[in-house]
Swiss-Prot record:
Superkingdom to which the source organism belongs: Eukaryota
Function as written in the Swiss-Prot or TrEMBL entry: This protein binds beta-galactoside. Its physiological function is not yet known.
Pfam families listed in its UniProt record: Gal-bind_lectin
Alphabetical UniProt keywords: Lectin
Native organism: Sus scrofa
Keyword Disulfide bond: no
UniProt xrefs under InterPro entries: ConA-like_dom_sf (IPR013320), Galectin-like (IPR044156), Galectin_CRD (IPR001079)
Span of domain Galectin: 4-123
Positions bound to a beta-D-galactoside: 65-71
Assembly notes: Homodimer.
UniProt cross-references to SUPFAM superfamilies, sorted A to Z: Concanavalin A-like lectins/glucanases
Name of the protein described by the UniProt record: Galectin-2
GO molecular function: carbohydrate binding; galactoside binding
PROSITE patterns: GALECTIN (PS51304)
Amino acid sequence: MSGKVEIMNMDMKVGKTLKIKGKXDDDADGFXINLGQGTDKLALHFXPRFGESTIVCNXRDGNXWGKEQRDSHMXFXPGSEVKLIVTFEEDGFKVKLPDGHQLTFPNRLGYSHLRYLSVQGGF
């Protein structure tokens, strides 16, 4: 995975929506979007893996990752346009994919305010 963008002092509270738009690199094998309190406190790790045709979601608390949630509804490919809408709710996240499919992932760490966003990989 190649590039990385980080925002350290974001102000995203429960009820807010984040729109992410970009283009996957032509030779990308995937990308990752992370939301949380910091690099090791991730409420949502959203990682489409092109080679596996799977979207993996997870949470990270310190050095410990949670149990992966996998969804085989792949709406991304190398070179494709990426448009995501992430809604932060008290009990979890709703991620709307470009084709309208929606994934949900629980707010396992119980955060009510997110300060960290990173986008990395072939994006």
